[in-house]
């Protein structure tokens, strides 16, 4: 008799995706971050759902409703800090996942990669709108500064900003619509994740060597399910440690001050996971130029497959490319640090240098060094 998991219309979809899925035998721990992201998304949707039951999206009561959640709701403080720090964990896993794709050449699966870029934009939009909801000082001014960037778009910019605001400034209408979109977007993200997996399972997974692994496949269960469960435990332990011991470590103290349109905070900055892009934005003196650089800092990922010049897929056997990759990582850390610093000497010039290096490495140095490696290998 055939096993029910192979015949039942619903179970066979799960079976072909998570049980009998043929997977390369050499997948390292870097392949754990995809499943981690799935867990993060689940945690965010669940905690967010319970938070939404107690939150009010009105400028008069939003800040107090968050305080009420933390003080009066059963385990409300836990929900709130799991949600806030869960977002940080989400972005850590997201950036490591993208980094893994860059290092091992996973971007050659163009459909999966492009859906991944869409996912990155959707998650960033969700996180930005979520940061506005507590209606603290940094929420309000962050929303004002970032939405105002759209005014740099020629001709329609000002109208577009006022249309998004629902008025002439960030106010009640803005908060209400941001809450609506913040609630809706994670479900769109979930749908995109399914499409991402659909395309991934069409081609099969890449592996660290970058060499086709068709002759050497193993079933996903039990090998990778056990490996993922161990990873989940490590990740959730790290998240629990952060939430229970220092929940405000990654937050901004200014967000514990209720939003005041008449008083600007000394340093307006987004959450840490946007600081690298914020640093690139600030490093260009022209407003439109800064906005274009900001968008391109993420959108540049879409042209990475076109810039792949190496005869090898992965960087595993390409030491020069590895050096450049880790230089890129160092540049991103530098940009993240600069994004949190005030706009003054020497931070301005460091930020500008790091921004130029970021684009230079991806657009020119990586393809050039790949051609050099091809030549050295006589390929």
Swiss-Prot record:
The keyword Transport applies. Its cofactor is heme b. GO terms for cellular component: mitochondrial inner membrane; respiratory chain complex III. A ubiquinone binds at residue 201. The keyword Nucleus does not apply. Heme b b566 binds at residues 97, 196. One of its GO terms (biological process) is mitochondrial electron transport, ubiquinol to cytochrome c. The chain crosses the membrane at residues 33-53, 77-98, 113-133, 178-198, 226-246, 288-308, 320-340, 347-367. PANTHER family: CYTOCHROME B. Component of the ubiquinol-cytochrome c reductase complex (complex III or cytochrome b-c1 complex) that is part of the mitochondrial respiratory chain. The b-c1 complex mediates electron transfer from ubiquinol to cytochrome c. Contributes to the generation of a proton gradient across the mitochondrial membrane that is then used for ATP synthesis. This is Cytochrome b.
């Amino acid at each position: 008799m055939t096993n029910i998991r192979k015949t039942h219309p619903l179970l066979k979809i799960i079976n072909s995706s998570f049980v009998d899925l043929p997977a390369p035998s050499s997948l390292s721990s870097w392949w754990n971050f995809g499943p981690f992201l799935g867990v993060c998304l689940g945690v965010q949707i669940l905690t967010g759902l319970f938070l939404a039951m107690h939150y009010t999206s009105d400028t008069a009561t939003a800040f107090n409703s968050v305080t009420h959640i933390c003080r009066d709701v059963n385990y409300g403080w836990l929900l709130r800090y799991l949600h806030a720090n869960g977002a940080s964990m989400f972005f850590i896993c997201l950036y490591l996942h993208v980094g893994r794709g860059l290092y091992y050449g996973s971007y050659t699966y163009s459909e999966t990669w492009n859906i991944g870029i869409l996912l990155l934009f959707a998650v960033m939009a969700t996180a930005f709108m979520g940061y506005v909801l507590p209606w603290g000082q940094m929420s309000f001014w962050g929303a004002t500064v970032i939405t105002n960037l759209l005014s740099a778009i020629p001709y329609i910019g000002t109208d577009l900003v006022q249309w998004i605001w629902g008025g002439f400034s960030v106010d009640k209408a803005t908060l209400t619509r941001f809450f609506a979109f913040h609630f809706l977007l994670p479900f769109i993200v979930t749908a995109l994740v399914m499409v991402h997996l659909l395309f991934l399972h069409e081609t099969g997974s890449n592996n660290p060597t970058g060499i086709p692994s068709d002759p050497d496949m193993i079933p996903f269960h039990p090998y990778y399910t056990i490996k993922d469960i161990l990873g989940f435990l490590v990740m959730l332990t790290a998240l629990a440690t952060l939430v229970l011991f220092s929940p405000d470590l990654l937050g901004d103290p200014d967000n514990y001050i209720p939003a005041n349109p008449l008083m600007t905070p000394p340093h307006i900055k987004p959450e840490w996971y946007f600081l690298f892009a914020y640093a690139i934005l600030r490093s260009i003196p022209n407003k439109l130029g800064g906005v274009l650089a900001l968008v391109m800092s993420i959108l540049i990922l879409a042209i990475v497959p076109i810039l792949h010049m190496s005869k090898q897929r992965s960087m595993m056997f390409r030491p020069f490319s590895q050096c450049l990759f880790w230089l890129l990582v160092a540049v991103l850390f530098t940009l993240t640090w600069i994004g949190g610093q005030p706009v003054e000497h020497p931070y301005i010039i460091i930020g500008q240098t790091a921004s130029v290096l970021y684009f230079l490495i991806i657009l020119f140095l990586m393809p050039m060094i790949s051609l050099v490696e091809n030549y050295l290998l006589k390929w």
